[in-house]
Amino acid sequence: QQFPRITLDDGIKIILSVQQSGVSKINFVGGEPMLHPHLTAWIKAAKRLGMTTSIVSNGTNMTEEWLVEMRPYLDWLGLSVDASTDELHAVMGRGRQGELRRGESHHLARCDSIITFAKKLGYGLKLNTVVSSVNVADDMSSLVRSWMPDRWKIFQALPIAGENDSDIEALEVSDAEFTSYLNRHVAKLSGYPEIEIVGEDNDAMRGTYA
């Protein structure tokens, strides 16, 4: 489903409206927010209004130059990482189109480079992982320990009416499988209290996101 692209000015008006209604934090997500031509301006506008700003991205177009430019305006950097290996990422379709056509992905190397540089600049770091039938048996604990994010959000693959109904059934995991994945990683990372692990099952997500 295609929606009209929001203009620069309309986006700033929306940000101002939510800020004036008492919202103090704003998170830019997608799709892939880094593909939007007005994203940088909107983040800067939100920060100038005093809001806490964050983004969730797969790392597209996230250059060192952009990270340096945005450091005064962007508080939290979130990266979508679903697996501990790029073999799994290739199966899940997380990678650049050319890579995926060859049956490969270099997503982890790109994320590692972004995270290393972003942490030097002092960004807050979040990881987002969607648990599906492809990665439900994966162990991400070593990878998460190596990156030491401030927060790791773990989501259950969510069916969305009119968006992914035709594709999601083969990827869905049961509530029990999701809980097992979450508890397993909480236990393995129990010695790292500085990593906040937050799990959101389907019920939680339906009640959280508009």
Where are these regions (language model features)?
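N-terminal pre-core extensions flanking Radical SAM catalytic domains
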Residues: 1, 207-209
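Active-site beta-loop-alpha junctions enriched in small/polar residues
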Residues: 31-33, 58-60, 82-84, 130-132, ...
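Hydrophobic faces of well-ordered beta-strands that scaffold small-molecule active sites
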Residues: 26, 53-55, 77-79, 125-129, ...
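Acidic (Asp/Glu)-rich catalytic clusters
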Residues: 19-20, 69-74, 119-120, 144-148
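Radical SAM enzyme [4Fe-4S]-AdoMet core and its adjacent flexible, acidic
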Residues: 87-207
